[in-house]
Amino acid sequence: MLTVAEGILLCFVTSGSVLGVLGNGFILHANYINCVRKKFSTAGFILTGLAICRIFVICIIISDGYLKLFSPHMVASDAHIIVISYIWVIINHTSIWFATSLNLFYLLKIANFSHYIFFCLKRRINTVFIFLLGCLFISWSIAFPQTVKIFNVKKQHRNVSWQVYLYKNEFIVSHILLNLGVIFFFMVAIITCFLLIISLWKHNRKMQLYASRFKSLNTEVHVKVMKVLISFIILLILHFIGILIETLSFLKYENKLLLILGLIISCMYPCCHSFILILANSQLKQASLKALKQLKCHKKDKDVRVTW
């Protein structure tokens, strides 16, 4: 049984996850309409893939959390562990790959650098995405053996703390290799944000001689993209902190309240960042405002029918 505080927090994280699925579903729907209208772009493709992956991430986090709360014996089963581990590696790595690709796409489209390497990357943006896709496949090929290794050690020493049977250095190396792709894409996101800051600084210096209106428009674009990138980095850090809290609370402390707090923190990244993307993207923002107006009109029509 859950306490009152645990029940309230569980309702909160469940409601937030539903909103996150709806937000990502809206991005998916808006890009599907653009695809039907033959207005599908590279950014649209990345946003679509990102929305799909984040819906799966939310579902995995919430379903796994509910199982840990109400059916912990199922979580301890071999079948559940191996299936969830493989699915999590694929979906989580792919989600961060799409987010990093989006950040890099914004950098190449908005930033202005005179270096020939930047011009080369800007002209061959598809090649850059293919390179990142190759990095994703390499990260999978490294992560899968580490997942099997950790699972086998846990299976052999089921009744004892299985971490004891891995040397400390080996244990750290195994988890670094397991998340090597995530670490790489996270570093790319940080570098992208740093380059955008430099681009904004150079842009402000160059635009001092031009009209203030032109300057403000370009600066606004830079600042808007920087907010998206910084929010991504912060939320991703919180996401992994939440997963760590959730895992430790289940394996070591067996604290349900701490487990639910971990769920809340880990769900913030896939849920909140989707709404940040909607507000930062002019097309998605207009589509969301249009959808809200249609809902209001539908509600008014329904109220009028009820009064009659």
Swiss-Prot record:
Positions on the Extracellular side per record topology: 1-7, 63-78, 146-179, 249-257
One cellular-component annotation, GO: membrane
Protein name: Taste receptor type 2 member 106
Subcellular location: Membrane
Species: Mus musculus (Mouse)
Keywords: G-protein coupled receptor, Glycoprotein, Membrane, Receptor, Sensory transduction, Taste, Transducer, Transmembrane, Transmembrane helix
Gene: Tas2r106
Sample GO molecular function, one term: bitter taste receptor activity
TM spans (from-to): 8-28, 42-62, 79-99, 125-145, 180-200, 228-248, 258-278
